């Protein structure tokens, strides 16, 4: 019974997990591993979920903590090949400004800190500020201030 509830939950909210994986990992194989690790961590914590927060807030918290801790363990260094590939991907977009803008936005978001990435991802998902505050562990006012700074940072990165 518990397992059926969990599987249903994952099926219903797998998009949330995929978005966290995409935001924190470029390599598709590592992204799949991260997805599996997040599901595993959710399963380990599922029996202790008491419903004090919304289920999506709980899922975001575990997914982000898993992605961020995995990131810290591997301490990735951006390779010049990755930057060249990104540049080629952008220049090969045949003048499709929308596609280029999306790629530039993804690139800019990847330049943010782990917490900033988590916050902007939730904001793009239209998660209310009170839920972002609860997930990240800061006040709602602090979320507003940080979101303004993050938006400015992204604008600046996209201009350069």
Functional labels for PLM-detected ranges:
Residues 1-19, 32, 55:
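A short, charge-rich alpha-helical start-of-domain segment used by transcription regulators
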Residues 9-28, 45, 109:
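Amphipathic, Lys/Arg- and hydrophobic-enriched alpha-helical face
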Residues 33-40, 44, 53-65:
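Structural recognition of an alpha-helix C-terminal capping motif at a helix-to-coil junction
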Residues 38, 62, 119-120, 132-133, ...:
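Hydrophobic positions on the alpha-helical face of helix-turn-helix-like DNA-binding modules
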Residues 48-50, 61-81, 98, 149:
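Arg/Lys-rich amphipathic alpha helix in sigma70-family domain 2
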Residues 76-102, 128-129:
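Internal acidic/polar
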Residues 111-131, 135:
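Short amphipathic alpha helix immediately N-terminal
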Residues 136-160:
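DNA-recognition helix of helix-turn-helix
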